[in-house]
UniProtKB/Swiss-Prot annotation:
Presence of keyword Mitochondrion: yes
GO molecular function, one term: NADH dehydrogenase (ubiquinone) activity
Main location as per UniProt: mitochondrion
Subcellular location: Mitochondrion inner membrane
Organism of derivation: Sminthopsis crassicaudata (Fat-tailed dunnart)
GO BP term, example: ATP synthesis coupled electron transport
Name this polypeptide is given: NADH-ubiquinone oxidoreductase chain 4L
Family under the similarity heading: Belongs to the complex I subunit 4L family.
Keywords from the UniProt entry: Electron transport, Membrane, Mitochondrion, Mitochondrion inner membrane, NAD, Respiratory chain, Translocase, Transmembrane, Transmembrane helix, Transport, Ubiquinone
Transmembrane portions of the chain: 1-21, 29-49, 59-79
Function in brief: Core subunit of the mitochondrial membrane respiratory chain NADH dehydrogenase (Complex I) which catalyzes electron transfer from NADH through the respiratory chain, using ubiquinone as an electron acceptor. Part of the enzyme membrane arm which is embedded in the lipid bilayer and involved in proton translocation.
Cross-referenced PANTHER family: NADH-UBIQUINONE OXIDOREDUCTASE CHAIN 4L, NADH-UBIQUINONE OXIDOREDUCTASE SUBUNIT ND4L
Amino acid sequence: MLSINLNLIVAFLLALMGVLIYRSHLMSTLLCLEGMMLSLFILMTLLITHFHMFSMSMTPLILLVFSACEAAIGLALLVKISATHGSDHIQNLNLLQC
C-alpha cells in the first residue's frame, strides 16, 4: 500500500511541476490540472478504503464532480480564447483589452 501511495504522490507532484513549467500554454496547464485531480481522486479513494472511513465515501465523488466542472469551464475558456486571439499562449493575453 505504501508504494501505491508514494506513486500517487509523485504523480501529483509531477503534475504540479507541469503546471509550473508549462504555464505559457493554457491547454498544457489544463492537462496538468486534470492529472492532479485524478491522482488526488485515486489517493483519496485508496485512503478511505484502507482506513475504513466509509462515512467519507462520498468525498471522492464530490472531488470528481468539481474536477469535471473545472475541466468544462477550462475547455470553454480555451475555445473562446483560441477563437478571439488565435492561440492559447497565456502571455499574449491582455485582460484590459476585452
